[in-house]
Amino acid sequence: MTRVLVVDDAKFMRVKIREILEEANYIIAGEAADGEQAADLYKKLRPDLVTMDITMPVKNGIKALRDILTFDPKAKVIMCTAMRQQRIVTEAIELGAKDFIVKPFEETKVLEAVSRVMGH
């Protein structure tokens, strides 16, 4: 079973993503509300996949992505963002994010991204 770390500063978004993934039989390994928590939890939990917001307090998703990939260059991270700025998305992909989801999103978009990244 695929274990996922869900990262978003908005609790309702973490809940929404968790519900979508659990309904599809993914296991939620943990949740974080900022990038610093995300990087720390990644090191402790070693999930198979991370869904991560970009705009967060303390440490944003781009900085957390860098930290996670420094620790584990093979980490699979899907960035979630309400920002439609191509520059930010391009930066995340160039750093090593495997995919991205634009908020607001439909359940199918989340599952399609997870499936692409996990190869199923």
From Swiss-Prot:
Domain named Response regulatory is located at 3-118
PROSITE patterns reported in the protein's UniProt record: RESPONSE_REGULATORY
Could you tell me the keywords of this UniProt record?
Phosphoprotein, Two-component regulatory system
Entry-linked InterPro entries: CheY-like_superfamily, Sig_transdc_resp-reg_receiver, ST_Response_Regulator
4-aspartylphosphate: residues bearing it: 53
Domain of life where this protein originates: Bacteria
UniProt-listed Pfam families: Response_reg (PF00072)
Keyword Lipid metabolism assigned to the entry: answer is no
What Gene Ontology terms for biological process does this UniProt record contain?
phosphorelay signal transduction system
Protein name per Swiss-Prot or TrEMBL = Protein CcdB
Taxonomically, what lineage is the organism? Bacteria, Bacillati, Bacillota, Bacilli, Bacillales
